[in-house]
Amino acid sequence: NKEYDCIIGVSGGIDSSYLTYIAKKQFKLRPLIFHVDAGWNSQIAVDNIGKLLDHLELDLFTEVIDWEEVRDLQIAFLKSGVSHIDVPQDHAFFATMYKYAHFHNINYILTGGNLSTECIRNPKEWMYFQSDERQLRDIHNKFGAKKLKNFPTTSILWHKLYLPYFKK
């Protein structure tokens, strides 16, 4: 009786596009397509999302992140010297998608990935939860130039404790 069975995070790339196709055609799901624009969209990705939506007749929700804040955070992470410099963008993706799902009572989030290109064995020192709001804010406080007013945040506790055990 819900409008959507799940949310699918879509970038416009092959992995999330293929996942969307399989979810709709093979598993007969009713996904809401969720896209986060953090300022790095290519025209090809935007065109791919449009074609996917048209072909599969799906709805799209796009969250646009404040580019100046994304830029400032990314520069702060570069200046900090940590190896996981892509955290600001990943953090925004997961924060917005999980919060949207939570507040719209959508219980499942699907994301596309590719083991052959995204799961190269990195040194353990490089591994870090992108959902660590405290580290994100600490790095920004030390190396950022602007105040974060609109940047979406989330925390490990919200993901690992609240959502699985306390969400009603």
Regions found by a protein language model. Give the residues of each.
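Short glycine/serine/threonine-rich phosphate/pyrophosphate-binding segments
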Residues: I14-L19, A92
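Short, glycine-rich nucleotide/cofactor-binding loops
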Residues: I7-D15
